[in-house]
C-alpha cells in the first residue's frame, strides 16, 4: 500500500515534471524543483483533492520544502 509520501511524491513529480527519484524531503519547491507561484497553487489544489483535505493560506505560506508538504498532509489526514 502506498504511503502518504509515496502518493504525494508521485503527484509532485507529475506536476513539476521532475523524476520521482529527485524528490526528497529537503528539496525546495521554488529553488530546487523550479516551481513558480501558479505551479505551487495548482499543486496544492491537486494535493487537497487527492487527500481530501483543505489547507489554509497560512499553512501554505509556511511550506517551502517537500518535507513541509508531507508534514502538512499528515497533519490533516490523522
Please describe what each predicted stretch is:
Residues 2-35, 39, 43-45, 50-78:
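Phosphopantetheine-dependent thiolation modules in NRPS/PKS and related acyl-activating systems
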Amino acid at each position: 500500500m502506498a504511503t502518504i509520501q509515496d502518493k504525494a511524491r508521485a503527484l509532485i513529480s507529475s506536476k513539476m515534471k521532475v523524476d520521482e527519484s529527485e524528490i526528497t524531503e529537503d528539496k525546495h519547491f521554488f529553488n530546487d524543483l523550479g516551481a513558480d507561484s501558479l505551479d505551487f497553487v495548482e499543486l496544492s489544489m491537486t494535493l487537497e483533492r487527492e487527500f481530501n483535505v483543505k489547507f489554509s493560506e497560512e499553512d501554505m505560506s509556511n511550506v517551502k520544502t517537500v518535507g513541509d508538504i508531507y508534514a502538512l498532509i499528515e497533519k490533516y489526514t490523522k
